Amino acid sequence: MFVNFILIILLFQCSINIKENNLETNKNTMLVHFIDVGQGDSILIQVNKKNLLIDSGPNESEDKLKKYLKKLNISKFDYVIATHPHEDHIGNMSYIINNFEVINFYAPKVENSTKAFETMAESLIRKDLKIKILKANMKSIDLGNNVIIDVFSPLSNRYEDLNNYSPIIKISYKNTSFLFTGDAEELAENEVLNAGFDLKCDVLKIGHHGSSSSTSEKFLNASNPSIAVISVGEDNTYGHPTDVVLSRLKEAEIYRTDINGNIVITSDGLSLK
């Protein structure tokens, strides 16, 4: 109960490079790393000498995440986003909070928490880090040099399914754009569609690891990506990605962490080389 009370207080306060080479950034390059954390999500964006982390994957993948970040010599995250309270997305957030300098920490306001979320919150309290609320129509986050983050959801404070708290986020760099969806289900997708947001993107991170409950035909038609990335565990017990979603993606170039491992997409602001 004490942790839940503290949580409430806190909450209110481009080339495809699947071999992981050429990871150095310069002032004209944005790197988007889809880190292979098994059945979960962890995405690192590097641009303008800034590091942005979206989710941290499940705790069982901690060693993978550690090795990947160590290879990149990362010591600081300018922005960290916890999309929703499920362990496969925030299982390593305590490791991130405890071992790296974190400047800004974002998460949606949720009515219910999980053990993984409470563990994360305890680490935030120890580091005296406040959670900044992610919600639709909040002010865009400007990363400089024409890199903008727009947040399209959540559009409600109450969802029965925690997946729908996942923020649908668009990161634009000049003429290129990436759409990140966490585990947002069709309900959240429809809310964003009905709100009239510009979902068109070059790269779409497929929702909920390729579950049939996400990435609806309407959402896919609106986003119309040329590249689709699925973060998913090899031989997972959920049957992800589903054949239904894969068939919907027939017009896109598909990359999967269970097949390709770590995936890196590079943008120069004009194209994905």
Each PLM stretch: what is its role?
Residues 2-273:
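Non-globular, low-confidence helical/coil segments that flank catalytic cores
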